Amino acid sequence: MPREKQKRGRRAEAKRKRDDVITDPTVLKRQKSSDVSNYPNRSYEQLEIRGDYIPLDEELVDSTGTAFYGLLDIEEQEYFSHASGLLELNQFETEEEKSIFIERVYEEANGKELKIACSQSCSRLMEKLISASTVSQIKRLFSKFIGHFLDLVQHRFASHCCECLFIHAAQYVTSEMKKKSSKEKENLEEDSTSELQLEDLFLKAISELEGNWGYLLTERFASHTIRVLLLVLAGKPLRNPSTTTVIASRKKEYLASKVGTQLDPSISEKQAVPTSFNKALEKMMKDLVTGLDNTYLRALATHPVGNPVLQVLLSVELSHMGKSKAKDADSVLRRLVPDENLQEDGESATFLKGLFYDPVGSRLLETIVQDAPGKFFKLFYKIIVRERIGSFSRNEIAGHVVVRILERLSKEDLKSAMDLILPEVPPLVERSRLTVIKALIERGIVRGVDLGPLAATLLSAYGDDAVSRINNMLKLQRSNKENDGTTSSSNTSSPEQLHGSLLAQAMLKSTGPLCELVQSSLLAVTPETLISIAQDPVVSHVLQDALTLPTSTPQFRRQITSRLSGKIAELALHSSGSHVVDALWPATRDLIFVKQRFAEELVVHERALRDSFVGRAVWRNWSMDLYKRKRGSWIAIAKGLEDSAEVNLNTLTNKPKSNIDLARARFAAKANGSKEPANTPSKKIPTTS
């Protein structure tokens, strides 16, 4: 079929016409003013208008709207990756050498801080540097981040650097505040050229984020930073187990321990914060929820990203701002639960009941139970929980909320709750859901509730046979299979085995039938099974507690230690068994002949113990060097006549002090303001006949 006749060069002519239209200056001006909204990216628009000219002082913006700070070249990546490896190995000879190395890395990173923070391969170096930095280095880095926090907190890698920076800077805010107050008392004028205080740097960072709280609340990475900021402003502990779970997930890797940095112990305690922090906290909390209606706020309760932020908001509101804040109509708690009387079929009661069974919302309910005012909790327990606590205990998710509820009950309420939970104990034992039972035992010990009915129920659930009882409780059949080589890894433990071990440890803390259930089972098993228990990393804690807790009677300790005779050296060379050997030292405090027999076993295997890391620890904890050289001193320690950690050999042997000891004593006495130390022997004046 003949083709249609077409003119040659039509495409080139059409392209030439388009180029003529674009290069027309009048068209360019109209396009710049009217069609600017068609460009989703401002930098792309400037690139089209200015041709190949890109201003060097302006940052590029990628298609997602976040700033792009550039990439490290290959040499820089290799250098910083090598520095990260050296910091993680932490094989510096002295702290001074480590400080010099960190300062050199900071010098090399000068001007590249934002690139490093946003780098997938080098952002971990930034976290390690922050963990090992001094306060001046943290201030310097904080100042480099100022002006970029809105983009950094939303970045996948830089957000972790921001969290690390805030956490480590928070521990210096209190010390700076104390120094500032002491200077004011002394009426000292501060240098006008001095660097900004961390207090001011924090406030600048918060001011950058203002106006964006609404979408940052549910942003995947920025929400973590918001939680940290709330806790820092409130002065709450940042390394407390109760707050760590809401700051980051369980998979969060804390790099401070890897670089050998010891965090200030005050970071795990409540901090004193400046007055400006309290004002900034109130404004931040108000801005976070002002634009949200009650329906959206309740939806956040089951939102996987927004829920942890809501937990921190509630915790800070109820614990930091006082219980009276809950009465405020604009408070987070009152907006979530507006019904003050909690009617059975009301909207608030329905909302709270739904949180019990939601895997995300139940965590918010735990926070409400922990921190809510007493009046609200009593009403909540009476209307919603009291008659349903048995059914709540059956559910795997609601059981965690029940544990928090049991922690706040009085003795009478705890007794009635236990009566309702007892019928659910056998099915809970069968499915290895033991957290509620463990909480009942622990709270019963604290409140002084009779735990006899619970012991009888556990006896019927686990069976009368002592051997099968301990096997079912600690899941020893699984451990035996691992020892036979049928399991790929013997170091991993199942949740059922862990929960059974924790339940047995709680039972050992109770005097009476609960403790006897575990002790009788440990005495009934064969010595081989007892050794396997001692060598298991999870269930060995049961044997350690059975030996050392006050509920352990001399008769029980005498029987259990005799079954370990001949196996002490084997246990001392095992990573888990060595802890059992350490527990045998206080367990045989009134059984000196047993302790001497164990010491003889250790002496026979001295070479093997000294060649092993855990063996050397056992040798040191048992003071075996003293046993070989000064048997009398060792026996005095073994009987508890002397401190086991530090032996005063001068007292034991009546050895007089040397001249250097006397000189040290005189120097210490002069430092304390006295002329002569009290224990300095008086000089004898020769008498003339």
Swiss-Prot record:
Q: Where are the Pumilio repeats?
A: 108-143, 291-334, 382-419, 524-562, 563-600
Q: Where does the source fall among the domains of life?
A: Eukaryota
Instruction: Locate the compositionally biased regions of type Polar residues.
Output: 677-689
Listed disulfide bonds for this chain? none
Quote the InterPro entries the UniProt record gives. ARM-like (IPR011989), ARM-type_fold (IPR016024), NOP9 (IPR040000), Pumilio_RNA-bd_rpt (IPR001313)
Q: Cite a single GO MF annotation.
A: RNA binding
Q: Where is the composition biased (Basic residues)?
A: 1-15
Subcellular location as annotated: Nucleus, Nucleolus
**Entries under Pfam families matching the protein:** PUF_NOP9
A Gene Ontology biological process in which this protein takes part is:
endonucleolytic cleavage in ITS1 to separate SSU-rRNA from 5.8S rRNA and LSU-rRNA from tricistronic rRNA transcript (SSU-rRNA, 5.8S rRNA, LSU-rRNA)
**Any single Gene Ontology cellular-component annotation:** nucleolus
Specify where the region named Disordered lies, as residue ranges: 1-39, 477-496, 670-689
- What are the record keywords, sorted? Nucleus, Repeat, Ribosome biogenesis, rRNA processing
Similarity comment: Belongs to the NOP9 family.
Summary of the function given for this chain in its UniProt record: RNA-binding nucleolar protein required for pre-rRNA processing. Involved in production of 18S rRNA and assembly of small ribosomal subunit.
Task: State the protein's name.
Answer: Nucleolar protein 9
Name the gene behind this protein: NOP9
